[in-house]
Amino acid sequence: MCSQLLKTQSPVSLRLFFLTQLLSSSILVWESTKATTKSKFVQDCVKLAYGNDSSVVREDRFAGVPALSGTGACRLFAEFQRRFYPDSQMFLPMPTWSNHHDIWRDSQVCTRTYHYYDPGTKGLRFQALVNDIKNAPDRSFFLLHPCAHNPTGVDPNYEQWKEISHIFKIKNHFPFFDMAYQGIASGDVERDATAIRIFLEDGHLLGCAQSFSKNMGLYEHRVGCVSIVSWDDKQATAIKSQLQRIVRAMYSSSPVHGPLLVSTILNDADLKALWEEEVKVMVDRLISMRITLRQTLEELNSSSSWEHITKQVGMFYFSGLSPEEVNHLQRDFHIYMTNDGRISMAGVTRSNVDYLASAIHEVTSVNNSNCIDSKHFEFVV
């Protein structure tokens, strides 16, 4: 059985398998140390997001609890916001991950949107974003994607984050960062935390949702954390007690297996280095496929500009394809994506990138005399 496993497992899943087996041998110990394990996990999450040398970490100025991945972390914060800031709203970027709207709506927190993406340039609509932040009521709540914005893959640069932080400070806004892709934007987990650390350096109180579904491949383990930065350790203790009350009524207790996997990796120098190396390998492949897709489209002499493919970062390529073009790809080429044109770059490989590029070229060519007759492709795959 072991030899069969060695033949079929990928390097990442094989290492995770052996680590899981190692931890499984200690399952009886876990049962007696769940509270300690989860407390350590929260510490590890906060250090990863805020930095080992952050004053927030040194002074224990944070409240945090394990959550059921990123969705659970956002849901906990939304409930916290509803209970203690009942008249507040959450400003969401337009567009954002569709589940954000459902999470805050189900928590009975009103949502509004702020400008973010420019369909014309397929880039950041920065000045409109800044204006919306300035025009929002003082002390508003804003959800921010610190890296690898979902679905657009468009992130502010360092100077833009500094300006955003400055305006937040003037307006006394509260930033809530949903960090589902730390490491997936640049291949460097430290670099991808830059936005959050800019806000911390500027003295903001803030909230953060973290998920290890993508960067550690622990999707089915539902491993996440929500943390809130406070003025002092006493306030942090009070906030934590309220978060724990919400957890108790919502799902009582989170699993311990996933958090222990994360803590084991983050506290072992060799394992952490291996993890960071594998994240970079994964991101390098995504970048490589972006370059290949762009080059292939440009070689087809497309009249469209495709530079946004390589300017965007993260798992997704926000293509800018219209709903009609998306439907055309599905109907005639059996290429599937979300209706807003978001393509998962993880599904693009060297064996299918030419086909994908040709199909995109076909549906975006206005006067293409070689358009495929859809009647010839009426079959189910």
What are these regions (language model features)?
Residues 274-332:
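Conserved PLP-binding catalytic core of the aspartate aminotransferase-like
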Residues 119, 154, 189, 214, ...:
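Hydrophobic alpha-helical scaffolding
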Residues 1-34, 40, 44-47, 249, ...:
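N-terminal "arm"/small-domain region of PLP-dependent enzymes with the aminotransferase-like
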Residues 111, 175, 206, 336-337:
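Hydrophobic beta-strand scaffold residues
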Residues 201-279:
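Conserved core segment of the aminotransferase class I/II
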Residues 60-61, 308-314, 338-342:
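Short Gly/Ser/Thr- and Asp/Glu-enriched loop/turn motifs at secondary-structure junctions
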Residues 179:
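Walker B catalytic acidic pair
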Residues 22-172, 182-184, 189-201, 321-322, ...:
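Conserved core of the PLP fold type I
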